Amino acid sequence: MEFDFSEEVLRRALLNIYSRDFHPATEIEINLFNEIWAKMDKAAKEGFSKSKAITPDEDFRNAILRNNAVFSAFKVHRMQNDMARLLLDSNGILKPFDKWVQEVLPIASHQVRHWLRTEYDTAVIRAHQAADWQQFLRERDILPNLKWLPSTSIHPGADHRPFWNTIRPIDDTFWNIHRPGDRWNCKCDLTATDEEPTPLPDEDDKNKPQPGLDNNPGTDGKLFSDNHPYQAEAHKGAQKAVDKLMARIDEMIAEMPDYLTGEEKMAIARNNLEMEKALKIKKGKPMDVDKADKQNANPKHVEEYILDSKGIYRDKRGNRYRKNSDYDKKRDTPYSCLLYTSPSPRDLST
């Protein structure tokens, strides 16, 4: 499969990181985040489709997709900080943009091409295995054991060879420690069986799972564990930045209608994040219609009509008003589409 990363997305991300408005320790670069999250979700869906199991239920799928966002956010935080560290020269002066870009392109290329491709391929495998595991749980009354199948790789590694053809019950603690997919690009597999269990194989340190692959995505819904270096060895501020971003995503999703699928809601959230960034807007405190119309959020707002018992204007309830001499139409009408409640000029009569 052809794998690429948008040059335009990378360009926008570099411009954003270089700008004074961006804070790499406390924010997540949205252009990179959305692109990487979308690719990880694509990998997950590809993995689900390769499994012969029934498609995982929506709650489990949503957990996988949301955790892909968490992984992507930590990856971006690492990447943006690795590049931001090179912004200043030895004298503490900001480098010219073109010079800085030349210095950080190797970092960017490594993260969004070489490593991202490896992460994508591994995510496909582990999503496939997660779907399989859900099916194993559904069939455990008939097929209570799991069998480790040999690698299909042309050049299989030696680390998993001792586990080939091992058969253990699905709830055996062995599967908490070792599973196909706990090495990068592992091509081993599992199958459910009613064959009798075999003895536990010998183990040594060479057989340990690689960091970030030491969990079972079929039970926790994470294609990469919390022990991945992006998270376990994150730069300062990463956890707070990721938590803040995920809280905003969860907030947006909670406000969307129930007829949308989780996948559709997350896609809309991605789009909303881009809009918020592009327009430099953020959600404020809730405001009722009256407050919004009266522009109470703006302490300098001036009303066009003010109450006056001797005023010549009256509303439908009999209240009298006069024109406010301090009102300036050009200055004090903030929106051309402003909707009036009483007293609206349309409701006043002389």
Can you describe what each PLM-predicted range is?
Residues 1-109, 194-339:
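N-terminal leader/targeting and assembly helices and adjacent pre-domain segments
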Residues 95-100, 113-117, 136-140:
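Short, glycine/acidic-rich hinge or "gate" loops at secondary-structure transitions
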Residues 104, 108-116, 124-132:
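N-terminal "first-domain core" detector
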Residues 122-196, 331, 335:
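Conserved short secondary-structure elements within globular domains
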Residues 340-347:
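Conserved small/polar residues in nucleotide/adenosyl-binding loops
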